[in-house]
Amino acid sequence: MSLMSSSMVLCHCLSFSSQNPDPESSSSSLLRYKPCDSISLWGKRRKKLWRFVPSAEKNNSHTGNNNKRRRSWWQRFFFDDDGNWLGLRDDDIVDETTELAKDDEMSDEEKFETWKRRAEAIVELREGQEEIGDSGVVADVTKKWEDWIVDSDDSFVESWTRDSAGSDDNLELDELTIPDGGLVKMVRDMVLGAEEEDILYEDRIFRYASSKSAKFLAVLILIPWALDFLAHDYLLMPFLDRYVKTVPLAAQTLDVRRNQKLEMVKELNREKARYRLEVEIGKSPPLSDDDLWWEMRGKALELRDEWRLENRKAFANIWSDMVFGISLFVLLYANQGRVALLKFTGYKIINNISDTGKAFLIILITDIFLGYHSESGWETLLEIIMEHYGLEVEQSTITIFICLVPVIMDACVKLWLFKFLPRLSPRVSNIFQEMKRH
């Protein structure tokens, strides 16, 4: 059985070429040996049994790639017989070049999806090992070594491997298995770097996601802001200046409003009081009524022009902010992969925060926007928004808005805290239950 299997494997590695376009090399290449990377010899000291085992290829076997990558320099120094201690083999160089070429062909989204699937698989494997415990170590190692040994492309070698393995597999697995707990595991991880590979890989994923997310976030901020600035200052404002001069209806629409006139009156009264104070303290010469009237008239015209300019800017803000929103929507819609990457980064950042930190952030945000002292903050925010767009709203409307919207938001947040948060993070929910708000 062993001899028949060996002959089949050797025939599998030899390739006969009957046609050769080169006449000079046709005689020498009639029987040509094809290098077979999937054949390795393993020996047993106990039973003196030598057998051929097909190894998994790099691109098809994740476990084989990990085992090769985990071989440290001193293992190659003591156990490799070819003298190539740094691992610079021709096949490895060719394979690495092929992998680099494939990585260059893949887009950033495809690379991220591949790395994300591998990271999720690593996390699921760790969780499964923690749930199974020491009883599942042999089964896990058996599955890894079966995936590395068995070649699904060669049915003959696969059947021979299953028949010839027999009961010796358990002995080999017992020899290859290393205990997971205590000092032995720590020393093994330090020497072999078994867990360091996964940690470095996860760090590389998070570093890649963080850099890409930071760049995309900068694009989301800079490009819409630049378009907003260009549309406001170089398109809309010059157009409105000419349009107001030629169209009387537009000039009337963007003229000084009632509340602005009241502000102008207050400013003129303060200016008149300032002139009188300077005359009384001797800082300015006394002015006649006509001179004071001309001074107040010039100040009133200056204030009128300023308020008209503010009205045109507020009207231009509406359209420029629409440009900002449309450009932001286009960027988000055209970059779904980067949006998913940004969500992944945000999820990882939030997930890395401790439960106490999460509870602190929730308390801070809710108290700022929904606390008993947040009424003045909401009022100021609404006034800034109304002034930005040049809207004239009564104080009663702002009061009604503050009495309704923050209260509804507070009810929704409390419902989420007491109903859905215990499912997502029980420890954070326990912190909230221990707190007594007065």
From Swiss-Prot:
One of its GO terms (cellular component) is chloroplast envelope. Disulfide bonds: none annotated. GO terms for molecular function: potassium:proton antiporter activity. Disruption phenotype: Pale-green phenotype in developing leaves with reduced chloroplast size, specifically under continuous light but not in the dark or in short-day, and associated with non-photochemical quenching (NPQ). The double mutant missing DLDG1 and FLAP1 (dldg1 flap1) has a pale-green phenotype similar to the dldlg1 simple mutant in continuous light, but a lighter pale-green aspect in fluctuating light and higher NPQ than in flap1 single mutant under short-day condition. One of its GO terms (biological process) is potassium ion transmembrane transport. It comes from the Eukaryota. Residues 1-54 form a transit peptide. This is Protein DAY-LENGTH-DEPENDENT DELAYED-GREENING 1, chloroplastic.
